[in-house]
UniProtKB/Swiss-Prot annotation:
Designated name of the protein: Shugoshin 1
Phosphoserine: modified positions: 14, 256, 436, 507
Compositionally biased tracts (Basic and acidic residues): 267-296, 308-318, 410-421
Disorder noted: Chronic atrial and intestinal dysrhythmia: A disease characterized by dysregulation of the cardiac sinus node resulting in sick sinus syndrome, in association with chronic intestinal pseudo-obstruction, a disorder of gastrointestinal motility in which intestinal obstruction occurs in the absence of a mechanical obstacle.
Keyword terms, alphabetized: Cell cycle, Cell division, Centromere, Chromosome, Chromosome partition, Coiled coil, Cytoplasm, Cytoskeleton, Disease variant, Kinetochore, Mitosis, Nucleus, Phosphoprotein, Ubl conjugation
GO biological process: attachment of spindle microtubules to kinetochore; cell division; centriole-centriole cohesion; chromosome segregation; meiotic chromosome segregation; mitotic sister chromatid cohesion, centromeric
MF-aspect GO terms: kinase binding
Amino acid sequence: MAKERCLKKSFQDSLEDIKKRMKEKRNKNLAEIGKRRSFIAAPCQIITNTSTLLKNYQDNNKMLVLALENEKSKVKEAQDIILQLRKECYYLTCQLYALKGKLTSQQTVEPAQNQEICSSGMDPNSDDSSRNLFVKDLPQIPLEETELPGQGESFQIEDQIPTIPQDTLGVDFDSGEAKSTDNVLPRTVSVRSSLKKHCNSICQFDSLDDFETSHLAGKSFEFERVGFLDPLVNMHIPENVQHNACQWSKDQVNLSPKLIQPGTFTKTKEDILESKSEQTKSKQRDTQERKREEKRKANRRKSKRMSKYKENKSENKKTVPQKKMHKSVSSNDAYNFNLEEGVHLTPFRQKVSNDSNREENNESEVSLCESSGSGDDSDDLYLPTCKYIQNPTSNSDRPVTRPLAKRALKYTDEKETEGSKPTKTPTTTPPETQQSPHLSLKDITNVSLYPVVKIRRLSLSPKKNKASPAVALPKRRCTASVNYKEPTLASKLRRGDPFTDLCFLNSPIFKQKKDLRRSKKRALEVSPAKEAIFILYYVREFVSRFPDCRKCKLETHICLR
C-alpha cells in the first residue's frame, strides 16, 4: 500500500500530462485540416488587388472578341461560297436553256440534217441508253449568238458563261429529266413534263425563287439561239425527240426568258382565247338557269298561297265554327286552370283545324301572299295562327268565376244575332278601329307588323242591339303592372286544385306568424274547443282529398261521434 502511494503522481504532474495530451490533439487536428485545405487555394494566393482583377477581365474580353471575329469571318466565307455556288447554278441553267434552244432550232429549221445524223449514228432501238443525248469531250469553245427570227432585242449575259466541262452531259427527253455524269442536277433546277398539244410536247423547266429574284428577273427578253461549231456532228438525236419543243413559261419565272417553237405560240394564244370565251359562256348559262329556277319557285309559292286562300274563303262562306277561344280568358291569371288545356300557346307552327274560322281582308292577304314564301321554303317572320273568340253557347257550361266587364257588354249581343250568318270583316275601316281590345300580355311576343293579323283578331263587328239580353262573360283583368312578389300560401294551395275551400284557409294553422310574442298570446287565447273544431275540419278535408285512406275515415267517424 505504501509503494502504491509513492508511485502516485502529484497534482502538477497530472496537469502537465493533460496539457501534453491536449497539444497532441491540437496538432493532429491541424494536420488533418491542412491536408483538406491543400486542394483549396491558400488565402495568400487569392488575388485581392483590383488592378490585377481588371487586367484579367480585359484579357478575357480580348479573347472573346477575337473568337467572335473568327466566327464572323467563317460566316462571311460560307456566305461567299454560297453566292458563288448560286452563280454557278445560274450559269448552268443558262447553258441548259441555250442547249434546248439549239435543239429546237435544229428540229424546226434543219429536219433533213437531223435525219442524216440519226442514220449515221447508232440505231435508236438498239439500246435503252441511246435515248439520251450525249455531248462528249467538248472543247472549251465560247458560245455564239445568233438572232432569232422576228426578235429585235437580244439578251446578253453580263458575266462570262463558263464553258461546258469535258464531262458528259445528258438530257433524257422521254422522262423530262436532265442528267450529268453523276445523274444529279443542282437543287435549284427542277424539271417536269407537260401534256402534248398539236403533236408537239412542251417541256417546262422551273427554277426556284433564287433564280426568279436574280438579275434575270424584271426584264422582258428572250434568249438568242446559241450554236456550237463542230461537236454537233457527234450528237445522236432519236426520232422520238424530233417533235419535242421546250418552253420556259412566264408563270414559272417572273418575266423570264422563254424558248418557243415558232408556230406553236399563235396556236397557244388561240387556245387561251377559246378557253376564256367558253368560260364566259358557261358562266352566263349558269346565271340564266339560276334566275329561271328562282322564278319557278316564286310562282309555285304564289300558286300555293292563292289555292290555300281560296279554300279557306270557301270554307268560311259555308259553315260557322262552333269552337272558338276567347283571348281575354285567363290572359294574365297564372293560376286559373279552367281553360288551361284549351289555351296552350307554343312557339312552333300550329296545325289549324278544318273547322277554324278565318276572316281575312282580300287585298292585304294577296299582297302578303306575294311578299312572303310558303311554309318551309321561306325564311320570313313566323305568324302564329290566331285564337278566336268563343261562342256564348259553347261557353255556357263553363262556370262564371268573375263578374261581367263593361267592355265585354259591347260585343255580347252580336254573337246571338250573327250566330247563323257567316262573319265578314270590314274592309274599309282603318287599322286604329280594327285593333282588338283583347290583346293580352301572352301575345306580345307574337305580334307582327302586318295589319292582316289585326283584322283576324277582330272577328266581330262592334254593333249594338239593345233588345238582346247581356250574356255573362269572364272579366278581363285590366292590371297594367305585373306583381313579381312571392305568392301567398292560399294562392299556392289553389295553384294545383281548383276545388279547395276558401273558408278552410281561415284556420290558424295556415296563418303566417309575423311576431313571436303576438303568436304566443294568440295561442294562449285560443280555447281547446276551437282547436278541436279546426282539427276535425282539417281531417274532413284530408279525407275528401285522399278517399283511399281507411285509417283517416275511421278516425273521422270516431271524432264526429
